[in-house]
Swiss-Prot record:
NCBIfam families: PRK05261.1-4, PRK05261.1-5
Keywords of the record: Lyase, Thiamine pyrophosphate
Protein name: Xylulose-5-phosphate/fructose-6-phosphate phosphoketolase
UniProt record similarity statement: Belongs to the XFP family.
Gene3D superfamilies per the UniProt record, alphabetical: 3.40.50.920, 3.40.50.970
Catalytic activity annotation: D-xylulose 5-phosphate + phosphate = acetyl phosphate + D-glyceraldehyde 3-phosphate + H2O; keto-D-fructose 6-phosphate + phosphate = acetyl phosphate + D-erythrose 4-phosphate + H2O
Organism per entry: Bifidobacterium animalis subsp. lactis (strain DSM 10140 / CCUG 37979 / JCM 10602 / LMG 18314 / NRRL B-41405 / UR1)
InterPro entries the record matches: Phosphoketolase, THDP-binding, Transketo_C/PFOR_II, Xul5P/Fru6P_PKetolase, Xul5P/Fru6P_PKetolase_C, Xul5P/Fru6P_PKetolase_CS, Xul5P/Fru6P_PKetolase_N, Xul5P/Fru6P_PKetolase_ThDP_BS
Domain of life: Bacteria
PROSITE patterns: PHOSPHOKETOLASE_1 (PS60002), PHOSPHOKETOLASE_2 (PS60003)
Amino acid sequence: MTNPVIGTPWQKLDRPVSEEAIEGMDKYWRVANYMSIGQIYLRSNPLMKEPFTRDDVKHRLVGHWGTTPGLNFLLAHINRLIADHQQNTVFIMGPGHGGPAGTAQSYIDGTYTEYYPNITKDEAGLQKFFRQFSYPGGIPSHFAPETPGSIHEGGELGYALSHAYGAIMDNPSLFVPCIIGDGEAETGPLATGWQSNKLVNPRTDGIVLPILHLNGYKIANPTILARISDEELHDFFRGMGYHPYEFVAGFDNEDHLSIHRRFAELFETIFDEICDIKAAAQTDDMTRPFYPMLIFRTPKGWTCPKFIDGKKTEGSWRAHQVPLASARDTEAHFEVLKGWMESYKPEELFNADGSIKEDVTAFMPKGELRIGANPNANGGRIREDLKLPELDQYEITGVKEYGHGWGQVEAPRSLGAYCRDIIKNNPDSFRVFGPDETASNRLNATYEVTKKQWDNGYLSALVDENMAVTGQVVEQLSEHQCEGFLEAYLLTGRHGIWSSYESFVHVIDSMLNQHAKWLEATVREIPWRKPISSVNLLVSSHVWRQDHNGFSHQDPGVTSVLLNKTFNNDHVTNIYFATDANMLLAIAEKCFKSTNKINAIFAGKQPAATWITLDEVRAELEAGAAEWKWASNAKSNDEVQVVLAAAGDVPTQEIMAASDALNKMGIKFKVVNVVDLIKLQSSKENDEAMSDEDFADLFTADKPVLFAYHSYAQDVRGLIYDRPNHDNFTVVGYKEQGSTTTPFDMVRVNDMDRYALQAKALELIDADKYADKINELNEFRKTAFQFAVDNGYDIPEFTDWVYPDVKVDETSMLSATAATAGDNE
């Protein structure tokens, strides 16, 4: 079930933390530190029972020690809190390079062996566990999807808070302690992530506890937050809306049990405050709380040798990765490593058979409350299919009555109505995210059934529209936050969509890349991770109709980023081009049913023609591309003089206008529309692509193909390089030309306008025969541009064109091309 309630959340402890638990946490810390070092350094003899030699050390030492002991300490206490309070909890490890802590945790709580039975709970299993870490044929170095309990790898830094807050949305029983490295805190996404506390509601959402892991250093430099004054540091977090607590340890000779007692007491104080916030949220008190956060100030590399080779190591940047880089190569480093590992007294922590002693784990949670077993961290286990409304009720039916090419419809408005009713049917498992663009991208029908969630004060109904402390729409002007919120919402079993201006999807190129890698690893080799809902991204306000914002807003290149993920038959990315509103609806339905994908859906928001019916759309979407027989005039491929192909709404509009003119000249052509770009890829590279036989039948085996493409032409060239007839393809795409100008001028400067396409088609057929017509078309392009320069709007021959199949009365004759009122939403 989605949003499961596990345990008895938000209950205060009615007694002090037991001394047995304190001792257990110290033993956990020691065993986790020992196992973390073992993962980085050892390939054999995991408990040093046999004579311990340099041959037991790995040849290549890979890993990060510096953050790991602090993470192990915190994990000990989080485990204790979960057990004592029976608190439903997911753990976020921002500094994911502390991966040894995460894998050690899941080994200690037993879930690692449950998912990987070959890693047994004995000396042989421990040796495999150590050896596999960052090793050929083994596991990665970070808190990767291979690790039970992880929903955040923490490889690319910056997204910890975005993922933490996305996980708690509509998940009121969930507690998410989120560890943030003080280096990560310098990244842009993390800096804005602090503001997430204004976008959640403690009544309907869970609670995030940010824990700043302030160990003072990055790879080779101090961290900014570690060097400002305590007053400035605390004031910063108060300004972000938090109540900061600070814990300092490891800089003197304080006994470790004393440190654990102090931290356990502080952790209970913090959790009591959280319980009070949750209790107050059930009353009529609507005041936004100052949520607690913890500054955890400890030495980098805590408990490692204080000096190595005469240089300060513990408490310095030198502890960041592998403090003893020559442990196999030099006796001096090896002896230091041996003494370091012996300092944790493994003989007190492991049984004779190599299993962990029961008194180490007695304080830890059991069953699904274990960090590695919580179903929220394997969201596919609790995911339920969306209750989707029938799509037919949203169809633009005018195309049936008035003909192909009818109307002036803003396609995303239809999607907005569809999302509205999805929210109605799934009120606590579907969200819409946007970087201040939900209305601009025409999804505002959602406000008919929900609000924008906002817990940051209200001024007046005159200016604060569609806002409430609870709602299924979340807006923050941060593409990072939108993508991060949605990813975590999906990773914990729910569904959603977010929209962005096309050019600014590039802001989160690398986030898409990271999520794709998570999905790739999952579908290749982690069968126990059940499929999660797909990232659905509406890419609107696109290059061809950004005429009111200009060159900076004109970049469709996210297609190229996603195409890099289409190999190996992992099938984790899709690129869809919605030709019209009906196409967009069918694409959305398919995407909302899909799992383990990143679905990029390209759809303009300006008024545009409706070309095909919903039934026609479904057939085309199934195939990925289709001939529009009603638009073709060639009866067979043998009769074709040129294939006119398009992907994208504006390229389709211009190809259709060109086809109208070519038809009047008697040119024989077929019209092909592409909706699912990746279906064009060679079937040798992609087993879901169309076959070479189908490709040749669609595009012909030997006729020239003029392909008008929404994005950069090299996308298509790269996809079809090994296809039949690929040498006969002429691809026209965005050529990095644009400005704040008119719709015609945008297509003109990129040779995408109908006149340029008509001329190019004639050139491909017989350049000499049609030389005069080609010159005439090129001259008209100059005339049309000059008209726009002189008048400030496009020439009527361009704006008044309507596809000849359209049958309308005088009151609805305005063409979609002429509907250029701009974007005032």
